[in-house]
From Swiss-Prot:
Region listing for PABPN1-binding, in residue ranges: 223-230
Quaternary structure note: Homodimer. Interacts with host TRIM25 (via coiled coil); this interaction specifically inhibits TRIM25 multimerization and TRIM25-mediated RIGI CARD ubiquitination. Interacts with human EIF2AK2/PKR, CPSF4, IVNS1ABP and PABPN1.
Protein name stated in the entry: Non-structural protein 1
Post-translational changes noted in the entry: Upon interferon induction, ISGylated via host HERC5; this results in the impairment of NS1 interaction with RNA targets due to its inability to form homodimers and to interact with host EIF2AK2/PKR.
Protein's organism: Influenza A virus (strain A/Memphis/18/1978 H3N2)
Recorded family membership: Belongs to the influenza A viruses NS1 family.
Record text about domains: The dsRNA-binding region is required for suppression of RNA silencing.
Source organism phylogeny: Viruses, Riboviria, Orthornavirae, Negarnaviricota, Polyploviricotina
SUPFAM superfamilies, per the entry: Ns1 effector domain-like, S15/NS1 RNA-binding domain
A molecular function GO annotation: RNA binding
Region (RNA-binding and homodimerization): 1-73
């Protein structure tokens, strides 16, 4: 096992512990609490994968951080902070929408890279909006927290979430997963739109009809799907 992988996990465990203390003292806002919960699940997955105990890793992580802070000068800290771009937290969904439980009549799940896509195949002929909470850096989507598909009535019918055992994803991973989710929902004659906020930070543009610009690969895949559906309809007639 790579030593850097272990030390990174140990430091992450300790920093999570520090952030938990902030929340316990009621100093954290809603996005801060949301990231804390998400990172807790991620740390559990990483700990299981690495075979490391989180409590023991936290103590070692504390020693690593204390050693760094002891050697760090105030001037170096100021320069480091000034040169590091700050990420922003973007919220399409409310806390209630983000944390609400939902159920599928005809569940379908697909793993696309480091992301898990879930959708209810029983949903037909609905107008659906994709909304997401995510972080942004340099005006581009950095990390997806959670994406959900909502009907006009407010029901959740689909979701994209990071895999806990596979931390880290790119903006292309997110766009590909969105393409898969849209294709799956449109299969049942649903009309799918993407929120303008998500369009702006994922694709850098906003489409009037609410649809994201698709890659040539996604367009070919959707065209094949449409032709296959037409053939089946003709055979049924």
């Amino acid at each position: 096992m790579d030593s850097n992988t272990v030390s990174s996990f140990q430091v992450d465990c300790f920093l999570w512990h520090v952030r938990k203390q902030v929340v316990d003292q009621e100093l954290g806002d809603a996005p801060f609490l949301d990231r804390l919960r998400r990172d807790q699940r991620s740390l559990r997955g990483r700990g299981s994968t690495l075979g490391l105990d989180i409590e023991a890793a936290t103590h070692v992580g504390k020693q690593i951080v204390e050693k760094i802070l002891k050697e760090e000068s105030d001037e170096a800290l100021k320069m480091s902070m000034a040169s590091t771009p700050a990420s922003r937290y973007i919220t399409d969904m409310t806390i209630e929408e983000l944390s609400r439980d939902w159920f599928m009549l005809m569940p379908k799940q697909k793993v696309e890279g480091p992301l898990c896509i879930r959708m209810d195949q029983a949903i037909m002929e609905k107008n659906i909006m994709l909304k997401a909470n995510f972080s942004v850096i340099f005006d581009r989507l950095e990390t997806l927290i959670l994406l959900r598909a909502f009907t006009e009535e407010g029901a959740i019918v689909g979701e994209i979430s990071p895999l806990l055992s596979f931390p880290g994803h790119t903006i292309e991973d997110v766009k590909n997963a969105i393409g898969v989710l849209i294709g799956g929902l449109e299969w049942n004659d649903n009309t799918v739109r993407v929120s303008k906020t998500l369009q702006r930070f994922a694709w850098g543009s906003s489409n009037e009809n609410g649809g994201p610009p698709l890659t040539p690969k996604q367009k070919r895949k959707m065209a094949r799907t449409a032709r296959s559906k037409v053939r089946r309809d003709k055979m049924a007639d």
